[in-house]
Amino acid sequence: MWQAISNLLSEQHTDGAEIELRNELPGGEIHAAWHLRFGGKDYFVKCDERELLPIFTAEADQLELLSRCKTVSVPQVFAVGSDRDYSFLVMEYLPPRPLDAHNAFLLGQQIAHLHQWSDQPQFGLDFDNDLSTTPQPNAWQRRWSTFFAEQRIGWQLELAAEKGLHFGDIDNIVESVQQRLSSHQPQPSLLHGDLWSGNCALGPNGPYIFDPACYWGDRECDLAMLPLHPEQPPQIYDGYQSVSPLPAGFLERQPIYQLYTLLNRAILFGGQHLVTAQKALDEALQ
């Protein structure tokens, strides 16, 4: 793998560049993570089994999409590829620090500008991706209520059922979610898709976001994540509101949007997350 990475990075360096440092980083819960120094420049490397190359390719595509918006900072992508055994993603190395109040407010403003970027008539994305390690379908759909009910809540419930986890009648739940959102047809916004404190940090040049699960959806979905994480700086919400105030009805829709993340946690981690997801589902749709 390291030879394949060296070959790709050599194309971006002067002759004679080579690996000078290679340290595995702690906290790689999903993929192995490394700090690599090559040709005097630092890189962040994610790697995993070769079969997971599509996940890294999708992540690179999402980071490049967010970068094109010129509204939020994301790590620059330098290479994505594989050898016979491993796949990898090579990005800019940005040692993360927690957001302070000022930079949290600034990030909130940047997220608001991201949500205002470009005009897209439909909900979805040109390709499927992943929420954490869970596959996320993104087939284009014109009705927001249909998209969210079927491709977010219905999808999670089907995945749960495949693992023997049942939260109620899937068809009835999907219909109930769709009915509650039927009168809400927002302008599609490009979302980060997994906006929590673990995917936001302070870098050398200000706040940045990473590990996206992008799609075009209701901007309220990104903001609905914030109350689920008490450690998330509240200034993110304040900064967002200063640029693009949320519409009436946001607080009523918020519990419905939170179901997507709560169901995903229940599938991934089980235990108390199953109880939390069931309680949230019952309360949101009562």
UniProtKB/Swiss-Prot annotation:
Show the Pfam families listed in the entry.
Fructosamin_kin (PF03881)
Q: Where are the membrane-spanning stretches?
A: none
Binding locations of ATP: 92-94
**SUPFAM superfamilies per the UniProt record, alphabetical:** Protein kinase-like (PK-like)
**Which superkingdom does the taxonomy of this entry point to?**
Bacteria
This protein's UniProt keywords: ATP-binding, Kinase, Nucleotide-binding, Transferase
List its EC numbers.
2.7.1.-
Disulfide feature: none
Listed GO MF terms: ATP binding; kinase activity
Active site per the UniProt annotation = 194 (proton acceptor)
Q: Which family does it belong to?
A: Belongs to the fructosamine kinase family.
Q: What does this protein do?
A: Ketoamine kinase that phosphorylates ketoamines on the third carbon of the sugar moiety to generate ketoamine 3-phosphate.
Q: What is this protein called?
A: Probable ketoamine kinase EAE_16955
Look up and give the organism this protein is from: Klebsiella aerogenes (strain ATCC 13048 / DSM 30053 / CCUG 1429 / JCM 1235 / KCTC 2190 / NBRC 13534 / NCIMB 10102 / NCTC 10006 / CDC 819-56)
